Amino acid sequence: MAAAIGVRGRFELLPRSGPGWLLSLSALLSVVARGALATTHWVVTEDGKIQQQVDSPMNLKHPHDLVILMRQETTVNYLKELEKQLVAQKIHIEENEDRDTGLEQRHNKEDPDCIKAKVPLGDLDLYDGTYITLESKDIRPEDFIDTESPVPPDPEQPDCTKILELPYSIHAFQHLRGVQERVNLSAPLLPKEDPIFTYLSKRLGRSIDDIGHLIHEGLQKNASSWVLYNLASFYWRIKNEPYQVVECAMRALHFSSRHNKDIALVNLANVLHRAHFSADAAVVVHAALDDSDFFTSYYTLGNIYAMLGEYNHSVLCYDHALQAKPGFEQAIKRKHAVLCQQKLEQKLEAQHRSLQRTLNELKEYQKQHDHYLRQQEILEKHKLIQEEQILRNIIHETQMAKEAQLGNHQICRLVNQQHSLHCQWDQPVRYHRGDIFENVDYVQFGDDSSTSSMMSVNFDVPTNQSDVSESVRSSPVAHSVLWVWGRDSDAYRDKQHILWPKRADCTDSYPRVPLGGELPTYFLPPENKGLRIHELTSDDYSSEEEAQPPDCSITDYRKSHTLSYLVKELEVRMDLKAKIPDDHARKILLSRIKNYTVPEEEIGSFLFHAINKPNAPVWLILNEAGLYWRAVGNSTFAIACLQRALNLAPVQYQDIPLVNLANLLIHYGLHLDATKLLLQAVAVNSSEPLTFLSLGNAYLALKNVSGALEAFRQALKLSTKCPECESSLKLIRCMQFYPFLYNATSSVCGGHCHEKPLDNSHDKQKYFAKPQSLDAAAEEPSGHGADEDPVLSVENAGRDSDALRLESTVVEESNGSDEVEKSDETKMSEEILALVDEFQQAWPLEGFGGTLEMKGRRLDLQGIRVLKKGPQDGVAKSSCYGDCRSEDDEATEWITFQVKRVKKPKGDHKKPPGKKVEASQAENGQRYQANLEITGPKVASPGPQEKKRDYQSLGWPSPDECLKLRWVELTAIVSTWLAVSSKNIDITEHIDFATPIQQPAMEPLCNGNLPTSMHTLDHLHGVSNRASLHYTGESQLTEVLQNLGKDQYPQQSLEQIGTRIAKVLEKNQTSWVLSSMAALYWRVKGQGKKAIDCLRQALHYAPHQMKDVPLISLANILHNAKLWNDAVIVATMAVEIAPHFAVNHFTLGNVYVAMEEFEKALVWYESTLKLQPEFVPAKNRIQTIQCHLMLKKGRRSP
């Protein structure tokens, strides 16, 4: 461990001369050597050497500037003190932060008054109805109305306003606002247990309508009776007509004596209180306390003050009521509930003040932190970057290389692109830090040619310099190329642009990865093995003889079974029957004859006679004949010759015909077959560069850029001479230096990849990168093994307003199963290889690996993830992708492509003239901004219905095709989910995924008592009877819920997500976003009632254009509960709100399938494809329904 030495300032241990150096050093020491505080600029290493710290702030860009040095020291010390203050301030904030999130729950459980109250104040009915009976004034109602009078069939009501016109009077409290606005008073429903309902009817023994008629007759006879007006007030209270209650009570007050006014006042106060004019009600009750029934008045006044939040007055009123009637349970319970609420609010106010104080401290801390960062920028402005300091140290120690024992030193120079070191004297050279010397292979002493070999050391700092003064290149150099295929780098002195290409050269020469047809083919000559063929001359045959081409079939050969399996399939390949001459092979053939004027017929005759009269091993001549037929373009004869050469060749030389046969296959576009032969050739002999170059070309054609790059690296390692390889050197070096130009920087394989690496020193090639998100998961019935095809999920890369983001999830579960199979990412299967090959072929090469360019939109490919469900051994038995269906395929592969849309940079790509039609189509499709248009096969939509369907003309599959297809299990429940991100809402702004959870698990609960309205769809049977739903739950949405914050935070457990949603929902019950998230939680948990409670709350508060998010969830719940009519209504509403979302159409189609309304389902699945053409589940369901309609006469589900 290095020990730090405190030295203020900075100086370099470099040899200098002259008095100027001594003067500057003494002046510097006199300035900086003061005080005890010190920076740790110098350190002592483990071997006792004093050297600078690489990241010291005293390493300046201008080390000669003394003023900047002194300012830098002041800034360093200031930053240290400021950092201490920030740390202390942060600790103070964290220690004093109020983290008590369970204050209310703990208070309700521990406070004595809360325990005595048993329920919170909010759960008590503070509008409890009260009244003062006439009997308490010794008045009998029977004395004022004729109870024996008959009542007509149409009884009258006691309308006080028609009996007497009352003038304005302050005694009737007409100055109060509630009385003035009596026409508009609200009338909440009275609870059935309100005692006012039984007062009159129980007393008079008649129905309430009959009593009203009798009161009306009494008022007709005596319009000034305060008793009759009070009876009329009781009547209208029972009828819940506040306006009439106030009118009758005002007249009762007008005619009542002072001692009897309390009856009318309590009636008036109850009506005003229930109409939310509680302050006016308090004034009225206070007037009744002058001479009144103290118990009723005080109890009523206690309820009013509790509602107004006047807790002290409320408690005092309840105490007075208890004095008048000790032991009254309702008053006792309300008194303790008020005290409980009062203390809770006091605690919450204290917590709020604490949090506000913490917030102010955090703002101050943020201000100080910003100041700290600005000072840090000032410090970094003059500081030398770490990489530059490392380079300076390397250069310094290189120049000051010392003799190992004597301490003598000499200055050496790096030459030849830093692959050799030139020293003045022939002395031993020692290097303390030789990071720069990975590519240095020898040292030259003096001016003669004496050299000394050098062993390479570990290369910690990747550098690639043309000379010492150049800055470090950013492009990594994988291996030294001092010796390129047996040639010294001096041989490339005039070809430096090939060996060390610049980025501009690579962009001009290879703007993209070459296509398969643009890559050269090679011929592996036997001369590389030391084998030679006798040169063919005209003496070998008579020119007068008829020219005959070489016939490899006439040769007797022994059958070798070792490699026959590699080429036996090639003999019957139809795609090899075409005649395609190979220009590369023709040039190689002519160069081997060394006479470019000889016609091909004569060359064929040479080879014909050589085969019949061999003067060399026959397999060598057959190898040459294979080259001839490659040049001519006859693949059948070429394969025959090379196959016989392969069988006759010794085992150690079998790589020669294998490589040449593989290049024939590459020329015919059979790149995957070629890779098999080339990998076998590598196993035979791994020292031939041409073998690896051929393998790299095959990988490039298969769009496996990472595999190709690895093959090219292996080729560069070899020292075997290979003049034919130099034509590909520039491409190889461009891909090495600038892999980002060809999207070769990631580990994602874009085509056919192999698990086995070319070199054991490298990690196994990964077929796909770490998955970023999973928007589609599947469960299939265990007995069917049917697999839905990839689900395409679309989302925008930014938060731009014009880049609408659609993130829909489609999940399929089988009835009675709720387990999601885990992905098996450790094995690569042929299914994946076939899938990506199809994917790559469907989309243009410009989009490989990083971006996709489709119809004017630029897309970024994020990753591929596989959820695999197969046999017990975990390996699929056969390949299947797209619409292929095999009856014995027991594996289910669900692949999700997640594509992000980003703004296309201006001037990034020039549109070719042939793309005008596509551009116009893209413009026409912009009315549905969320629709990502991707080219691909589209399912033909049926034409207009006719009496007799002609299925073939509709583009439907034929009955024979239907018998071959594997149908989708339409009875399986498909769950869909429309994320809030489709509305440009970032869920992380609503839910805190970052703060660790330090409290017990909670579950998000929504208000189940929201008022009934059409907005909450309570007219639907499934919503109104949600408590009795037969809902099985949707556990397959678990991963969707756990990945809500996947872009920024890791996956969390279901309990953690539920707790986070519950915390924020508890504070904000009016957020439709949080209510929708809570509904998703309850869908996973299988609690249909709680899920619908949350969806009602979301629908209650959501704007109209956002309602399709909760509507889609509600439609899925109703679908699951087999309430299909309700589900159709809800899903249709979602489509009407957002017709541009494919998931809305798909959901409605699923409901119609469950109802066996297959024609309607077809319509909605086809509209799904119009919005999202590559949505494979919709395609598969269309095919299944079409086949069902043709092959099934009954109306049962297929």
Curated annotation (Swiss-Prot):
Give GO cellular component annotations, separated by semicolons.
Answer: actin cytoskeleton; cytosol; plasma membrane
User: Where is the major localization of this protein?
Assistant: cytoplasm
For region Disordered, the annotated ranges are 774-793, 902-954
Record bears the keyword Acyltransferase: no
Spans of the TPR repeats? 295-328, 619-652, 689-722, 1071-1105, 1108-1141, 1142-1175
Keyword terms: Cell membrane, Cilium biogenesis/degradation, Coiled coil, Cytoplasm, Cytoskeleton, Membrane, Repeat, TPR repeat
Q: Which residues form a coiled coil?
A: 340-382
Described purpose of this protein according to its UniProt entry: Plays a role in primary ciliogenesis by modulating actin polymerization.
Quaternary structure, per UniProt, is: Interacts with CATIP.
The name under which this protein is listed is Tetratricopeptide repeat protein 17
